Amino acid sequence: MGSAKDKVAGKANELAGKAKKAAGDATDNNSLRAKGAAQEAKGGAQQAKGKLKDAVKGAVDKT
């Protein structure tokens, strides 16, 4: 996956995770809260992966 796709997918997962956590909070559903937190973390990791790809590409392009 390219860096832009990683960032977009990561942001989508992060937002979906936040929504699940909020729904879990509203319904007092611990399982939904946990799933939301996991999806939010996955999204953050995907975004970081995209940023890392950009940094590596930038470093390679400078050489």
Curated annotation (Swiss-Prot):
Name of this protein: UPF0337 protein RA1131
Compositional bias (Low complexity): 34-49
Biased composition regions of type Basic and acidic residues, renumbered to the chain: 51-63
InterPro entries in UniProt: CsbD (IPR008462), YjbJ_sf (IPR036629)
Keyword Lyase set for record: no
Family: Belongs to the UPF0337 (CsbD) family.
Classification of source organism: Bacteria, Pseudomonadati, Pseudomonadota, Alphaproteobacteria, Hyphomicrobiales
UniProt xrefs under Gene3D superfamilies: YjbJ (1.10.1470.10)
Region (Disordered): 1-63
Pfam families noted in UniProt: CsbD
Keyword vocabulary terms for this entry: Plasmid
